[in-house]
């Protein structure tokens, strides 16, 4: 886990807090990728940003649980409600604004762009 990634995640958490949500991010395995999930803290504020059931203390509805490697969690998985599709796209966009790419295996799996030994050494 590099400092740039942690700093970016901290900025994302601050942005989400202002929108009535909280970020949970854990380094996921030796690849340095991140498992990301978003929890609703204030449903009224969150309703201006995301869709679906927004009960305080519950995760934003992404169609499958975070951290569970299911075929339905893949980025290309179909058959979800418009709310779930919207929320997944919203999360991809939010993370991309902070230089994280969504890995194709799961909506909750992200890697920081330009991370790795070469980029870290170049800084």
Question: What is the meaning of each model-derived region?
Answer:
Residues 1-122:
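Cell-envelope/glycan interface and biosynthesis
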């Amino acid at each position: 886990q590099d400092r740039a990634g942690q700093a970016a995640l901290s900025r994302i958490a601050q942005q989400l807090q202002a929108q009535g949500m909280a970020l949970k991010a854990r380094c996921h395995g030796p690849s340095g990728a991140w498992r990301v999930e978003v929890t609703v803290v204030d449903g009224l504020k969150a309703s201006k940003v995301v869709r679906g059931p927004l009960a305080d203390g519950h995760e934003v509805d992404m169609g499958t649980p975070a951290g569970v490697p299911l075929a339905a969690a893949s980025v290309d998985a179909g058959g979800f409600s418009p709310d779930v599709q919207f929320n997944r796209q919203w999360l991809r966009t939010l993370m991309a604004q902070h230089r994280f790419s969504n890995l194709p295996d799961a909506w909750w799996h992200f890697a920081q762009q330009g991370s790795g030994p070469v980029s870290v050494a170049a800084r």
